[in-house]
Swiss-Prot record:
UniProt family annotation: Belongs to the extradiol ring-cleavage dioxygenase family.
Binding site for Fe cation: H152, H215, E266
Name of the gene encoding the protein in the UniProt record: nahC
Keyword Amino-acid biosynthesis: no
Keywords: Aromatic hydrocarbons catabolism, Dioxygenase, Iron, Metal-binding, Oxidoreductase, Plasmid, Repeat
Enzyme Commission code(s) on record: 1.13.11.56
GO BP annotation list: naphthalene catabolic process
GO MF: 1,2-dihydroxynaphthalene dioxygenase activity; ferrous iron binding; oxidoreductase activity, acting on single donors with incorporation of molecular oxygen, incorporation of two atoms of oxygen
Biological pathway: Aromatic compound metabolism; naphthalene degradation
Binding residues annotated for substrate, in chain numbering: H152, D199, H200, H215, Y256
Keyword Endoplasmic reticulum: no
Record note on pH: Optimum pH is 6.5.
Protein name, as recorded: 1,2-dihydroxynaphthalene dioxygenase
């Protein structure tokens, strides 16, 4: 039975990095991700579960988001969503088998969101059931993935209304969830959108940003793993942009730490299930105080 022509998860992402060795160490020792190096000189992979990979790390002259890969259920949904994008005036390119195989999927199309973020839509990812996830450091549990995808991202947008329209077309639901008073008397608004049970998979606001990617959130099943990750950041004197705290929207206990590429990683635990009813907040439940400024999140959240 054909399902709705809509995105169902953030399946994979690509990042460009200047220092691949630093990223290998960071991914394994700080976060507990598995590094998979198959001998390709320009890239390696990060695993979180049975998928061949969830993150592709490209060796580059830049440190930023390379692309986001959004999954649809199958070929009928892939074709229908592609037609929806064309009918709405968006430019897409359906890739050949060579490009699809490079991403290790059965079907692939490429486009851009209104903020210029490279956006890929795919179906049929490679799942390696004979190769279980082997964390880069001991974990008490695992990462929350499955039908919730790999995590969530906040990306740069210059036109929030256009971004909301684009992601709504892809099947996302959501709107403004934070209205944060600023010292200058203005109010920062952040929009959060979901496509599955994860509270949100994409978020954005009309804020200036040096990079496409502000942060990536990865969720642990066990609080012990979040605590150890936080301890490792402190022990290794890695910048913590926002201290431990609990968000009002997704109820997750998280902190925000710097990656070797200068954008933020948000390790978390116990995220809430998405709701369809719209509501907004003016701050967090507790914590998330600014510790290391300059990472694009210098706002008072509690």
């Amino acid at each position: 039975m054909s399902k709705q022509a809509a995105v169902i998860e953030l399946g994979y992402m690509g990042i460009s990095v200047k220092d691949p060795d630093a990223w290998k160490s960071f991914a394994m020792n700080m976060l507990g991700l598995q590094v998979l190096d198959e001998g390709e000189k320009d890239r390696f992979y990060l695993r979180m579960d049975y998928w061949h990979h969830r993150i592709v790390v490209h060796h580059s002259a830049e440190d930023d988001l390379e692309y986001l890969g959004w999954r649809v259920a199958g070929k009928p949904e892939f074709e229908a969503l592609g037609q929806k994008l064309i009918d709405a005036g968006y430019k897409i390119r359906v890739c050949d088998k060579v490009e699809a195989q490079e991403r290790m999927v059965l079907g692939l199309m490429k486009t851009e969101d209104p903020g210029g973020n490279p956006t890929e839509i795919f179906w049929g990812p490679r799942i390696d059931m004979s190769n279980p996830f082997h964390p880069g450091r001991p974990l008490h549990g695992k990462f929350v993935t499955g039908d919730q995808g790999l995590g969530h991202c906040i990306v740069r947008q210059t036109d929030v209304a256009a971004a909301h329209k684009f992601y709504s077309l892809l099947g996302f639901r959501g709107d403004v969830e934070y209205r944060i008073p600023l010292p200058n008397g203005m109010t920062a608004e952040l929009s959060f959108m979901h496509c599955n049970a994860r509270d949100h998979s994409i978020a954005f606001g009309a804020m200036p940003a040096a990079k496409r990617l502000n942060h990536l959130m990865l969720e642990y099943t066990h609080m012990e793993d979040l605590g150890y990750t936080h301890q490792q950041f402190v022990k290794n004197e890695i910048d913590i942009a926002l201290q431990l705290g609990i968000h009002a929207n997704d109820k997750a206990l998280t902190f925000y730490g710097a990656t070797p590429s200068g954008w933020l990683i948000e390790p978390g635990w116990r995220g809430a299930t998405a709701i369809d009813e719209a509501e907004y907040y003016v701050g967090d439940i507790f914590g998330h105080g600014v510790e290391a400024p300059g990472y694009g999140l210098d706002v008072k959240l509690s």
